[in-house]
């Protein structure tokens, strides 16, 4: 999981 993972709106990992 990326460090900027909140729920699915961050990076590009849906």
UniProtKB/Swiss-Prot annotation:
The keyword Disulfide bond applies. Disulfide bonds: none annotated. Its EC number is 3.4.22.-. GO terms for biological process: proteolysis. GO terms for molecular function: cysteine-type peptidase activity. Keywords: Disulfide bond, Hydrolase, Protease, Thiol protease. It is an enzyme of class 3 (hydrolase). Belongs to the peptidase C1 family. Dimer of two small subunits linked by disulfide bonds. This is Karatasin.
